[in-house]
Amino acid sequence: MSLIMSSVVATALVSLILAFIAFWLPSLKPDNEKLSPYECGFDPLGSARLPFSMRFFLIAILFLLFDLEIALLLPLPWGNQLFSPFSTLLWTTTILVLLTLGLIYEWFQGGLEWAE
């Protein structure tokens, strides 16, 4: 048997043995203490299902999108060392223009206003 196949079989065997032990070893019998919610040592005061602000959700999505675009700019110092630094400058300018246009669009749509 090859080394890779032996490793796969050994890993699968160890995983199955550990899963079998984890399934049969603890005899969990649910009681009131185990089924009660735990919140910093206190009983919960209210429902955990609070209304979620859609404005906060939109701000979080905008942050993720703009953060991703900024992450595209991180390898620029290495891109300037390529054979064609002009293409790096062109792509950098394109990304920055798209980022700026997206920010202006969200600004005019009122997506950056936290309170109305």
From Swiss-Prot:
It is a multi-pass membrane protein. Gene3D superfamilies: NADH:ubiquinone/plastoquinone oxidoreductase, chain 3 (1.20.58.1610). It holds the Pfam family Oxidored_q4. It is an enzyme of class 7 (translocase). GO terms for molecular function: NADH dehydrogenase (ubiquinone) activity. Its EC number is 7.1.1.2. It is found in: Mitochondrion membrane. Its main location: mitochondrion. One of its GO terms (cellular component) is mitochondrial membrane. The keyword 4Fe-4S does not apply. It catalyses: a ubiquinone + NADH + 5 H(+)(in) = a ubiquinol + NAD(+) + 4 H(+)(out). The keyword Transmembrane applies. The chain crosses the membrane at residues 8-28, 56-76, 88-108. Keywords: Electron transport, Membrane, Mitochondrion, NAD, Respiratory chain, Translocase, Transmembrane, Transmembrane helix, Transport, Ubiquinone. Belongs to the complex I subunit 3 family. Core subunit of the mitochondrial membrane respiratory chain NADH dehydrogenase (Complex I) that is believed to belong to the minimal assembly required for catalysis. Complex I functions in the transfer of electrons from NADH to the respiratory chain. The immediate electron acceptor for the enzyme is believed to be ubiquinone. This is NADH-ubiquinone oxidoreductase chain 3. It comes from Scyliorhinus canicula (Small-spotted catshark).
